[in-house]
From Swiss-Prot:
Official protein name in the record: Two-component response regulator ORR25
InterPro entries for this protein: ARR-like, CheY-like_superfamily, Homeodomain-like_sf, Myb_dom, Myb_dom_plants, Sig_transdc_resp-reg_receiver
Organism of origin: Oryza sativa subsp. japonica
DNA-binding region positions on the chain: 213-238
A Pfam family this chain is assigned to: Response_reg
Length: 694
């Protein structure tokens, strides 16, 4: 028996043992003939139950099974399934139905081949390949051999038992496989702030464009990190830097180191929360068109330690805001140093109405610009950069500061800041107000003049103040008395609106862009004939510039509603009783108002020019006006009268005065007319000299 099996194995495929199952006797006889012609050993049966019993009784006596698809006692696919589960033998299906769906169904159930009736000799000759393929697979799995037939059969039985056991324990096998797969998966790398900081340091040491994952991994020295992790993070980091460069217009390689690392860590936090890089608020605010808004972060100025409630001040090493006069041989101030403000309450008093928003309003709180004279610093270069950015061109002034300093103080070039007089800080109308006599006021075209150390502004901007009284129109916001400080500070709030933001249009001072010129040539364009007759000119050294057109502060602007009657009288009487013209006598001297000068405007109701150089509510003498201003002349014989109420028909028209008309004659004429005259369509009632009302 053993010798016969060994001989059959050496002559394979001769002697192949085949079990054929078909309920049709004709097909079964034809198949048997073909099998014998190919020198196979066939076993024929007509029912599936008999074939299944034979396989169970003698599982090692057959190498191959050929079964019909459609049988009476059992479906061929059912028999195929049972044989595959119990015996693990190769099964070939045959049928007269050659449809593709039927063939695919057979292959799906485990058939190794599908034959269409009538079966040809060529098909039968090639069936041995399935048996050979099956045996090679068993040999590979169990390291069996063909030394004799017994060993081959034993290997086949062992394989069948192993396969059956695995199928019975299919559920447990699936769970074990899932556990193995989860164990083999690579763990996800979490980028902590420390890892990201090491990554940023490595990238910027190598250069953003020259950094590669291999070199970055070598510099970071992290064992569990792979080049794929570094490459993914590097790609996201480059996209983040590109967005910053697009928003700010700056090269990422030129960012300050502290600012760069701070924003990178903030962006990492946003990345961990949202799954991608996102611009921080300090960078998001840089999309503003204001050039100073791009610096709107404490990290940009290396001032991360300041609290958000600190104020921004310009502080001098000797005296706060003690600016010298421009044009007296001052030298440029150097090295602004940032220091926190010690007492911000005094600074708020300088701006009782709460100045909000200007070209510097977007600078973050927490800075004091201290102008020191020693050496150079990064802050000085930063201020110079801010100056160049705001003007669109490099600064034409030497030094590391954007201002010219004189008299131990700091002031700015003529196209940015105005002159200073007597321990004050003064600025052009396009930047800051003008100060005189330790007060804080602005040029006449934007703000009104100051008297006796007070703070006064025109009716169209801010209320008027004199000698400790602060008067505001009813249609304006309430304000408080501005306490004059010996060391005035500049408080810059974070609000977005302010009257300062509207100052400084190009049509007012067309030559401001030329930094080689003083501001004086530009001012006469607004007042063409002031000072032409007696040589009076606008110079930085004159302290009485802001006092010109003193009476214009009491004129109502066209955009506001003036107050009349008892309401104005109740608020103007303290000013009339306290304002003295003697302060202006010594400073103003003689000056002429030219042909193009705007006419003097006077408010009605109880406003009178008193005697003894005082404005009071009492009735003065007729010669008080002439004695107060002996050199005051009105040169224009055709000076137009102006309505005080914005051009209405019932407005008060001032009388036209010729330069040759005597002032005393004018008063006598008014007396002769018994105090009543018609001027245009308005009506003037005289109760005293120059007291007119409706």
């Amino acid at each position: 028996m053993a010798a016969t099996q060994a001989t059959a194995a050496r002559k394979f495929p001769e002697g192949l043992r085949v079990l054929a199952v078909d309920d049709s006797p004709v097909c079964l006889m034809l198949l048997e003939a073909l099998l014998r012609r190919c020198k196979y050993q066939p076993t024929m049966t007509r029912d599936a139950a008999t074939a299944l019993r034979m396989l169970r009784e003698r599982p090692g006596d057959f190498d191959l099974v050929i079964s019909d698809v459609h049988m009476l006692d059992m479906d061929g696919f059912k028999l195929l399934e049972l044989i595959g589960l119990e015996m693990d033998l190769p099964v070939i299906m045959q049928s007269a139905n050659g449809e593709l769906e039927t063939m695919m169904k057979g292959v799906t159930h485990g058939a190794c081949d599908y034959l269409v009736k009538p079966v040809s000799l060529k098909d039968i000759q090639n069936i041995w390949q399935h048996v050979w393929r099956k045996r090679k697979l068993d040999i590979r799995n169990h390291n069996g051999g063909y030394n004799d037939g017994g060993e081959l059969v034993g290997a086949t039985r062992t394989k069948r038992k192993y396969t059956r056991k695995m199928r019975n324990d299919g559920d447990n096998y699936g769970e074990n496989k899932e556990n193995m797969d989860s164990t083999l998966k690579r763990q996800r790398v979490v980028w902590t702030p420390e890892l990201h900081r090491d990554f940023v340091i490595a990238v910027h040491e190598l250069g953003v464009d020259r950094a590669v994952p291999r070199k970055i991994l070598r510099m970071m020295k992290v064992d569990y990190m792979t080049r794929e992790n570094i490459a993914s993070h590097l790609q996201k980091y480059r996209l983040y830097l590109k967005r910053i460069s697009t928003q700010t217009g700056m090269d990422p390689d030129q960012f300050p180191e502290k600012w760069k690392y701070m924003n990178e860590l903030d962006a990492l936090k946003n990345y961990c929360e949202n799954g991608r890089y996102r611009l921080t608020p300090a960078i998001a605010s840089s999309s503003s068109s204001n050039p100073f808004a791009r610096m709107n972060s404490a990290s940009a100025l290396a001032t991360n330690g300041f609290l958000p409630t600190h104020s921004v001040q310009l502080k001098n090493s000797q005296r706060n805001m003690a600016m010298g006069t421009v044009g007296h041989g001052g030298s440029p101030g150097n090295n602004p140093v940032f220091q926190p403000l010690q007492n911000s309450s005094n600074a708020r008093k300088c701006f009782p109405s709460g100045p909000s928003g200007s070209s510097f309003a977007n600078i973050s709180n927490g800075l004091v610009l201290d102008t020191d004279d020693s050496g150079s610093s990064y802050a000085g270069m930063f201020c110079k950069s801010m100056w160049e950015t705001s003007n669109g061109s490099p600064s034409c002034h030497s030094g590391n500061s954007s201002a010219n300093k004189s008299n131990n103080g700091v002031s700015a070039p003529a196209n940015q800041f105005q002159v200073q007089s007597k321990f004050g800080f003064s600025a052009l109308a396009n930047q800051f107000p003008v100060q005189s006599n330790c007060g804080f006021s602005a040029p006449a075209n934007q703000y009104q003049v100051q008297s006796n150390g007070g703070f006064s502004v025109p009716a169209n901007q801010f209320p008027v103040q004199s000698n400790g009284e602060f008067l505001a129109p009813t249609n304006q916001f309430p304000v408080q008395y501005p306490e004059v400080n010996n060391q005035p500070l500049v408080q810059m709030n974070q609000s977005s609106t302010n009257h300062f933001s509207t100052i400084g249009n190009d049509y007012q001072f067309p030559d401001l862009a030329n930094c080689s010129k003083y501001w004086q040539p530009t001012a006469p364009s607004m007042f063409p004939d002031l000072g032409h007759n007696d040589g009076t000119s606008f110079r930085p050294s004159q302290a009485n510039i802001a006092n010109i057109n003193q009476l214009s502060s009491f004129a109502a602007s066209s955009g506001q509603e003036p107050m009349f009657g008892d309401e104005l009288h109740g608020q103007m009487s303290p000013i009339m009783s306290t304002i003295s013209l003697s302060d202006f006598d010594d400073q103003m001297g003689s000056f002429n108002i030219g042909n193009d000068t705007s006419p003097a405007e006077m408010m009605h109701d109880n406003f009178s020019l008193g005697s003894d150089s005082n404005i009071s509510s009492s009735t003065p003498t007729d010669s008080s006006f002439g004695s107060t201003f002996p050199d005051f002349h009105l040169d224009s014989p055709e000076m137009p009268a102006q309505m005080l109420n914005g051009g209405d028909e019932d407005g008060i028209l001032l009388p036209v005065l010729d330069d040759t008309v005597d002032q005393q004659d004018l008063f006598d004429q008014l007396d002769e007319n018994n105090g009543r005259e018609k001027l245009g369509s308005g009506r003037c009632v005289r109760k005293g000299p120059f007291e007119c009302f409706f």
